[in-house]
């Protein structure tokens, strides 16, 4: 979706603020993209980008209050933007599309976050994070199990785990005594839908509390069936990760940030990308966490917390409007999003056509998975954090071994949460 409008007008200068600066991994990609857009359109960018920290957040809010905001802004789409959204200082995607129908038309609107201030979508996202299930396909092949897909159900997943166990392998690489976070999150999500996953229970026996208890009961069930490593209660996450990469375990539930760890594990020198054993890496894949109940398998935990805004100031300036639109379209094209996001979350409708020599096979598989995602929902544990989680996170070994009653553990966490409010 690239606008022709900008090339027709007289060259203009637009001011842009992003967080692609300092140590940000995309700082150079951003500089290169700005230079290419300037070259293509004849326009120029006055770049005000800075490292994402509290200083930048304060500066942006102050800029809006004093009328010195940028024309285009790459910023958080959550509560940090509430002040300038509520003040009407940015233009919604729908309003921009009334004049430029192709604006962000390469994006799946279901994956674009609405502002919490008014439930309207303003920011066009680039990259974010996802949590999903990595697979060692060598183990699946040895056990005669098919690769799980977008249609795999929870019961089918349990059957697969049993076959893997019967073949002498560990079905699930997880250290429940160290990092139970991902299983806690998804097993609770499996009792819910994207619409209610971020609810915090008022008590262990209300609707949400019951869902949490049932989710933890599923983890206990997996433990009792012997689908976790024998040492899952005492092992470290690093140890169970090694069992996965060494071909002893089939499934690993983790985040998009784990792709790099799997890739470097397939290098003879973890620091040197040129030593990658591509045949070894080809044994790894990534897919959706099997769904249960009303959660579709393709509903992922993840998020796109930032995006490009066009300010009202730029929109109302006849000289700058088309250039601002052109800039955002350029920075959010399929090609550019693939470069910035790589294997992380995006809102692209289609898996981008990428130069596969620039990406490894696991990154390409992750991009393909993303194109089938039906929703991204944040992790409820990020809202229910700190000491609230001790009874069910640190307490997971006692929960799965039946030494602690699940409802009591959930209630203890809720009591801690309520006391902190």
Residue spans for each PLM region:
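Short, solvent-exposed loop/beta-turn-alpha elements that line the ligand-binding surface or hinge
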Residues: 94-107, 150, 192-214, 267, ...
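Conserved C-terminal helix/tail region of periplasmic/extracytoplasmic solute-binding proteins
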Residues: 141, 337-338, 346-357, 368-421
């Amino acid at each position: 979706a690239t606008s022709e409008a900008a090339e027709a007008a007289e060259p203009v200068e637009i001011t842009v603020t992003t967080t692609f600066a300092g140590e940000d991994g995309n700082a150079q990609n951003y500089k290169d993209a700005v230079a290419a857009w300037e070259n293509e359109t004849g326009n120029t960018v006055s770049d005000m980008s800075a490292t994402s920290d509290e200083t930048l957040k304060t500066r942006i809010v102050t800029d809006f209050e004093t009328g010195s905001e940028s024309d285009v802004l790459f910023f958080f789409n959550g509560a940090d933007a509430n002040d300038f959204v509520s003040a009407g200082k940015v233009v919604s995607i729908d309003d921009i599309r009334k004049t430029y129908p192709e604006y962000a038309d390469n994006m799946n609107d279901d994956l674009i976050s609405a502002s919490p201030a008014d439930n309207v979508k303003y920011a066009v996202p680039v990259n974010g994070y996802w949590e999903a299930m990595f697979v060692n396909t060598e183990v699946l092949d040895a056990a005669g199990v098919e690769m799980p897909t977008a249609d795999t159900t929870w019961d089918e997943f349990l059957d697969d785990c049993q076959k893997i166990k019967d073949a002498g392998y560990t079905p699930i690489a997880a250290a429940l005594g160290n990092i139970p976070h991902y299983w806690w999150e998804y097993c609770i999500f499996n009792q819910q839908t994207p619409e209610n996953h971020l609810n915090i229970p008022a008590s262990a026996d209300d609707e949400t509390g019951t869902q949490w208890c049932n989710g933890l009961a599923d983890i206990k069930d997996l433990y009792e069936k012997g689908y976790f490593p024998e040492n899952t209660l005492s092992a470290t996450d690093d140890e169970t990760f090694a069992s996965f990469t060494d071909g002893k375990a089939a499934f690993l539930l983790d985040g998009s940030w784990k792709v790099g760890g799997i890739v470097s594990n397939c290098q003879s020198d973890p620091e040197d990308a040129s030593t990658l054993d591509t045949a070894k890496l080809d044994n790894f894949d990534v897919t959706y966490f099997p769904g249960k109940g009303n959660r579709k398998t393709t509903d992922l935990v993840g998020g796109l917390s930032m995006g490009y805004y066009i300010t009202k100031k730029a929109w109302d300036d006849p000289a700058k409007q088309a250039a601002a639109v052109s800039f955002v379209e350029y920075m959010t094209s399929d090609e550019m999003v693939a470069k910035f996001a790589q294997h992380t979350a995006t809102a692209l409708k289609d898996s981008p056509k990428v130069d596969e020599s620039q990406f490894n096979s696991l990154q390409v598989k992750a991009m393909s998975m993303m194109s089938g995602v039906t929703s991204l929902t944040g992790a409820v544990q990020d809202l229910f954090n700190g000491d609230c989680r001790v009874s069910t996170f640190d307490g997971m070994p006692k929960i799965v071994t039946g030494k602690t009653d699940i409802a009591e553990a959930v209630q203890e966490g809720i009591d801690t949460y309520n006391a902190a409010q």
